[in-house]
């Protein structure tokens, strides 16, 4: 995408945003529980967040509050079946939770603060994308969950672009447009992400 084209799309989207009303949002804080962070990151793809994902994340936070680090979560998975911990039966998702947990443990990532710093290194992101089921959206979502500034382009954000008359964008193109819009509006990436997500989730 050329710089001129990016600026044109971003300006178009800014103008569209200014015709809408959005609920106020505050900066998201990490869970400070890697089991919850990993579970949220893996389950969010393709599932209803409020009805399916967050209740399971909350279950981990409440019932296994002492198992905060990546190592703790791996130990927890040795003590109880993961299907019971998460209360979820999809074997593919459960295996991805295991895979991501071991990957982060093997890379010395034990908490969200370490994860935030680790995700700032480009070569680490390249390694992370080699884990089965981890694509650019999950990487960006992990950045958000760790407290970093990021925007994770999901179906809601793609649909919002379509509403603004901007269609057929790749993930990277949409990411560039939204990043430019956040800069133009002088708001954080997370704030832009959350405002649009909440707006579209009500539709």
Predicted regions and their residues:
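Structure-specific DNA junction-binding interface
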Residues: 1-86
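Catalytic DNA-binding helix-loop module of base-excision-repair DNA glycosylases/AP lyases
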Residues: 41-43, 119-165
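Short, well-structured alpha-helical segments
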Residues: 54-58, 91-98, 125, 136-143, ...
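Alpha-helical ds-nucleic-acid-binding substructure associated with the helix-hairpin-helix region
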Residues: 59-130
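Alpha-helix N-cap and coil->helix boundary residues
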Residues: 52-55, 92, 152, 169, ...
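A basic, often C-terminal nucleic-acid-binding module that engages the phosphate backbone, implemented
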Residues: 42, 171-203
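Short helix-capping/linker segments at secondary-structure and domain boundaries
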Residues: 45-55, 104-111, 201-203
């Amino acid at each position: 995408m050329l710089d001129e084209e990016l600026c044109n799309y971003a300006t178009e989207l800014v103008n569209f945003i200014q015709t809408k009303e959005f609920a106020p949002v505050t900066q998201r804080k990490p869970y400070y529980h890697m089991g919850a962070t990993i579970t949220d990151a893996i389950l969010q793809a393709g599932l209803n967040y409020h009805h399916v994902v967050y209740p399971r994340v909350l279950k981990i936070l409440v019932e296994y509050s002492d198992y905060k680090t990546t190592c703790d979560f791996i130990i927890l998975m040795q003590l109880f079946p993961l299907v019971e911990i998460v209360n979820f039966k999809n074997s593919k998702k459960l295996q991805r939770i295991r895979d991501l947990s071991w990957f982060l443990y093997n890379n010395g990532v034990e908490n969200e603060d370490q994860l935030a710093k680790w995700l700032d290194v480009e070569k680490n992101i390249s390694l992370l994308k080699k884990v089965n089921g981890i694509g650019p959206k999950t990487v960006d979502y992990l950045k958000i969950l760790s407290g970093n500034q990021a925007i994770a382009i999901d179906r809601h954000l793609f649909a919002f672009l379509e509403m603004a008359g901007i269609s057929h964008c790749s993930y990277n193109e949409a990411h560039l447009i939204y990043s430019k819009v956040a800069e133009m509006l002088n708001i954080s990436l997370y704030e832009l992400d959350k405002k649009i997500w909440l707006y579209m989730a009500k539709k």
